[in-house]
């Protein structure tokens, strides 16, 4: 199951992403890469994009294994289908969702 951390994140992910997460986590995957293409495209090198879903040890999170020890490429997922357009659409949806949460809080 995906562990989501923004209001409406699961629905946004399901709507825009073509690839699964790495056990609910994101790093250099379609999701993060799309967001970076939207906000700071000069930092993204799509020619280096590779799919990698490293084996996740059953003790991950309960021992001292760092996320950096598990992936050869640094990728956890598949950044290849990432686009600036997806990132922009997700950012727009995040903004709408968090605005609704803030409006509820100030009522």
Predicted segments — roles?
Residues 1-107:
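Extended, histidine- and acidic-residue-enriched regions that form the cofactor-binding/catalytic faces
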